[in-house]
Amino acid sequence: MSNLSGFIKRLRDIMRNDAGINGDAQRIEQIAWLLFLKVYATKEADWEWEDENYQSIIPEPCRWENWAAQKNGKEMTGDKLLDFVNNTLFPTLKNLPVDADTPIRKAIVQTTFADANNYMKDGVLLRQVINTIDELHLDDYEESHAFGEIYETILKELQSAGTAGEFYTPRAVTDFMARMIRPKIGERMADFACGTGGFLTSWL
C-alpha cells in the first residue's frame, strides 16, 4: 500500500458525513471492525487452501465475500445494508458459539465483536467505506505487511491518539529501542502495555 495516509483520509472524509459518527474514537472503532473482517476473510482463504476440510466459524451469509465484497454494483447498500449489519451481522458474530476448546483463530471473531459497535447511520456512506476497504489486496505481500501500520496511521491521522484511549509510540523510537536491546533468537519478549504492537513489530 503506497499511500496509507491517503487511504485513511478517504475513510475519514466519508465518515465525516455520517450523523452517527461522533468523534475520532468512534471512527477508529468503525474502521477497526471492518478491517478485521476484511483481513479475516483473506486469512480464511489461506486456511481453506491449506485444509480442504476447514470450516469457518462465521455463517456463510456473514462472511465478508457474501455481504461486503463488491459485486459489480449488485452489493447491498442503503437501508438494506444497515438492517443486515445491525440485525444480522452483529448479533450473529457477538453470539458465536465459543468454548475452551474453540481454536483461537476462530474464537477471536466473537472476542473482537463482543464490544464492537456499528455507529454509522447512513447505509450509502457505509457502503462507500466498505468498498474502500474492500479495495485492499491483502494477498499481496507488500500490502499485507503494510496492514500492520494501518491502525497506527489511523491514530496519527486523526490527531487524537491520547483522547481515543491509545498512545502511539513513533516507529523510530521502537526501532531504536529494539536495536539497543539486541534481541536474539530463542529469547522471549513481552509488552505489558501493548497498544498498536509497535514494540513487538520492531522486535521481530
Over which residues does each language-model region extend?
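Short, small-residue-rich loop/turn micro-motifs
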Residues: I154, C194-T196
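Conserved SAM-binding loop of SAM-dependent methyltransferases across substrates and taxa
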Residues: T196-L204
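Non-catalytic, mostly N-terminal accessory regions of nucleic-acid modification and defense proteins
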Residues: M1-I185
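Conserved class I S-adenosyl-L-methionine
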Residues: G186-A193
